[in-house]
């Protein structure tokens, strides 16, 4: 699950760079949404991993 979160975070960052750089102005809102979803998924997976007591697989 953490792997998916990292993947979506990277996609959101790339989309954000393209959108905020003026290359694709329409992707700004999509990048914001994907970025915040990735942050939420990362936080949830980190908390679940801490509660289970296992080390995260990075």
Swiss-Prot record:
Topology versus the membrane: Multi-pass membrane protein
Major localisation: membrane
Domain of life: Bacteria
Keywords annotated in UniProt: Cell membrane, Membrane, Transmembrane, Transmembrane helix
InterPro entries for this protein: DUF1328
GO cellular component term, pick one: plasma membrane
Location in the cell: Cell membrane
Membrane-spanning intervals of the chain: 4-24, 30-50
Signal peptide: none
Record-stated family: Belongs to the UPF0391 family.
Name the record gives this protein: UPF0391 membrane protein OCAR_5266/OCA5_c27040
């Amino acid at each position: 699950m953490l792997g998916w979160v990292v993947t979506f975070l990277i996609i959101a960052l790339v989309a954000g760079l393209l959108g905020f750089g003026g290359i694709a102005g329409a992707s700004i809102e999509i990048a914001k949404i994907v970025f915040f979803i990735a942050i939420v998924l990362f936080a949830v997976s980190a908390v679940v991993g801490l509660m289970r007591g296992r080390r995260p697989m990075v």
